[in-house]
Amino acid sequence: MNITIISVGKIKEKYLSDAINEYSKRISRYSKIDIIEVADEKTPENPSEVEKSKILEKEAERILKYLKKDSFLITLEILGKELTSESLAKKINDLSISGKSDITFIIGGSLGLSKNISEISDFKLSFSKMTFPHQLMRVILLEQVYRSFRIINGEPYHK
């Protein structure tokens, strides 16, 4: 299994970097894990719809450069499907059993993801209807991927 996380924006806070490194290390027992950061665009204070669209398209171009043709794409979107931890584990396990050994998760920047990226997504996943900072979302996603592997392998995990 190969897990790739493509995320818009850099992690600036040490405590988030530490958490990302810790969960990446834990996941590496079960799967190869790659985290790719693409640059985010500077967003003006009150961007117009045209400015938002241009920003999202520039970020989408950067994301597209890293997509593998045969990877199963899961985008993180507010309007995606909400899953329990057990359901996410089942989804990852089912993909693995069906021969999809490459899964790519995509986390957008402060404005989310462009329609172009959303349209090519194989599965739209929502963690909540609430908005989270994309840097924190990376930690939350990694924790849930780690938890999924623990569930898949019948290992105990914190409830």
Swiss-Prot record:
Subcellular localization, as worded in the UniProt entry: Cytoplasm
Coiled coil feature spans: none
InterPro entries (UniProt xref): Alpha/beta_knot_MTases, RlmH-like, tRNA_m1G_MTases_N
Principal location: cytoplasm
One Gene Ontology molecular-function label: rRNA (pseudouridine-N3-)-methyltransferase activity
Enzyme class: transferase
Residues binding S-adenosyl-L-methionine: 76, 108, 127-132
Its biological purpose: Specifically methylates the pseudouridine at position 1915 (m3Psi1915) in 23S rRNA.
Family named by the database record: Belongs to the RNA methyltransferase RlmH family.
Protein name: Putative ribosomal RNA large subunit methyltransferase H
Upper taxonomic lineage: Archaea, Methanobacteriati, Methanobacteriota, Methanomada group, Methanococci
Name of the gene: rlmH
